[in-house]
Curated annotation (Swiss-Prot):
The keyword Glycoprotein does not apply. GO terms for molecular function: rRNA binding; structural constituent of ribosome; zinc ion binding. One of its GO terms (cellular component) is small ribosomal subunit. The keyword Metal-binding applies. Pfam families: Ribosomal_S14. Binds 16S rRNA, required for the assembly of 30S particles and may also be responsible for determining the conformation of the 16S rRNA at the A site. Its cofactor is Zn(2+). Gene3D superfamilies: 30s Ribosomal Protein S14, Chain N. It comes from Roseiflexus sp. (strain RS-1). Belongs to the universal ribosomal protein uS14 family. Zinc-binding uS14 subfamily. One of its GO terms (biological process) is translation. Part of the 30S ribosomal subunit. Contacts proteins S3 and S10. This is Small ribosomal subunit protein uS14. Zn(2+) binds at residues 24, 27, 40, 43.
């Protein structure tokens, strides 16, 4: 989990709009963010394996 202070800091409006960055909506992680799903790769993997994301399946061949 990300530090609460950093999550709150990211939510505040920035002085310059280019400073704004995305964070995972579940854990608050700023890196490896997947814009289409709004979460980081770790949370995406956990949710996909549990079947919580519609249309996403684990590939096998």
């Amino acid at each position: 989990m990300a530090r609460k202070a950093l999550i709150v800091k990211a939510q505040r409006p920035q002085k310059y709009k280019v400073r704004a960055y995305n964070r995972c909506k579940i854990c608050g992680r700023p890196r490896a963010y997947m814009r289409k799903f709004g979460m980081c790769r770790i949370c995406f993997r956990e949710h996909a394996l549990r079947g919580l994301i519609p249309g996403v399946t684990k590939s096998s061949w």
